[in-house]
Amino acid sequence: MTKNKSKNKSNNSNISNNNNNNNNNNNNNNNNNNNNNNNNNNNNNNNNNNNNNNNNKNGESQLKNKNKNISENQHIYDKHNHDHSHDHNHDYDDNNEDDEEKEELEHYQLIVSTLLNYSQYSLHWVKDMQDFFHYKLSEDEKKLLPNYNAKMEALARAVLVNSQFLKKIGNEHCNIFSQSSDNSANSERIVDPTNLDHIKIDYFMMDQLKSTIRQLVREWSEEGKLERDQAFEPIKQQLLEIYGHIPFQERSKIRVYSPGAGLGRLCLEIASLGFSSQGIEYSFMMLIVSNFMLNKVEKINEFKIHPYIHQTVNVLRDIDQLRTVTIPDVLSSELLPKNNPALEFSMSAGDFTKNIEENSFDCICTCFFIDTAPNILEYVDCISKILKPGGTWINFGPLLYHHAKKKDSIELSYEQLRYLICKKQFQFKKEEIRDAEYCSNQKSLLRSIYKCQFFVVINNKPT
């Protein structure tokens, strides 16, 4: 679950959604990384999906990144929303600020271009396999594979189905708007979807996109319910055990924070219980896709995707590789509580260790997240600071440590981690080891089971 190296800084991007606005959207529009994917890219998928990864009481679905505004539903970028506290230096440098904004815009362009270029990349991949068959195999060998060409043609058709969906997401983000002083929006196209030939495909970013497609199955399909039940349900049940005595309409005063929010489903599920829920996700790719799933989908099972076509190993039957999955299994507008204007639901982009607001949350939920840290001591310290005195930290996930091959990384045993947590004035209330999968292909010949640490601790720092 190594962090995707997104150029956007903490607090630069925000998707928010609360009960009031979702009701309006529903009435008017009906809108609103630990990955073993069972192929040779197992760790890559985790790296892309679960990484360090604001509250907006107006409730409009928003994606914030400086002063650029993208998409249609008043996705406002606020230049003054950038938090400089992460470097403990509040001196303003126009040149540095301009450089950062340029880098962020370039990274954003790269992500949108990747979404729009998926078919170009993937059809080339299919052609490479076809060329190997036609030019590298002997005629006798070809006769042994009479259905191979038909499979390649089916893969190409599946690529186009995926591309149709991904282009919908990319096209939503081709335009950004600069908010002028008189609040008028000046359109500025950052990517021209009709002119992509000059854009070089970034293969690392394309791997992130393929990983994100599989993440859609985990978070937004009926097939993903098995994994959600394994990982999300224990967290939700624990929230209800701790705060369930609070009347539903009053639970919005309990603020729950979810670092490594991925595609937003866990944050949405937490909000569905009546809690104010905020997620933070480091990958801008994930944030853009989650924005679409939370705010742009109009009906259940609206889209079909072929999430496993790029998995060429551990395949039992060709039909398993080519199969479709429909998304979403729910609409966010249907899960969010009605008639509760105090409830806040938001997602922001950035590194949660660089966006510290001390004593600001009642509960922190980490799911397949803490082992994304190169320095897990920093994670524990930040969690302690962010929680209010007496606040609760609920964790579910393994200790895969995806920075382990790098020299600047520290990997603790659970025994060492537990000692560290206690020394940071946390008190353990529950400890279990539970089995869970992560973005597994249910039809694959290889599926990995994680032994996950599920614990609940109370922050006993002084008030």
Curated annotation (Swiss-Prot):
Comp. bias regions, Acidic residues: 94-103
Keywords from the named record: Methyltransferase, S-adenosyl-L-methionine, Transferase
The organism's place on the tree of life at top rank: Eukaryota
One MF term in the entry's GO annotations: carnosine N-methyltransferase activity
This enzyme's EC code(s): 2.1.1.22
Bias (Low complexity): 9-58
Keyword Lipid biosynthesis appears in the UniProt entry: no
Residues annotated to bind S-adenosyl-L-methionine: Q215, R218, G260, E281, D351, F352, C367, Y379
Residues binding carnosine, per UniProt: D371, H402, Y450
Gene Ontology biological process terms from the UniProt entry: carnosine metabolic process; methylation
Basic and acidic residues: bias regions: 79-93
Chemical reaction(s) catalysed: carnosine + S-adenosyl-L-methionine = anserine + S-adenosyl-L-homocysteine + H(+)
Region annotation (Disordered) ranges: 1-64, 79-104
SUPFAM superfamilies, sorted: S-adenosyl-L-methionine-dependent methyltransferases (SSF53335)
Entry keyword Methyltransferase: yes
Function according to Swiss-Prot or TrEMBL: N-methyltransferase that mediates the formation of anserine (beta-alanyl-N(Pi)-methyl-L-histidine) from carnosine.
Similarity section: Belongs to the carnosine N-methyltransferase family.
Name of the protein this chain belongs to: Carnosine N-methyltransferase
Provenance organism: Dictyostelium discoideum
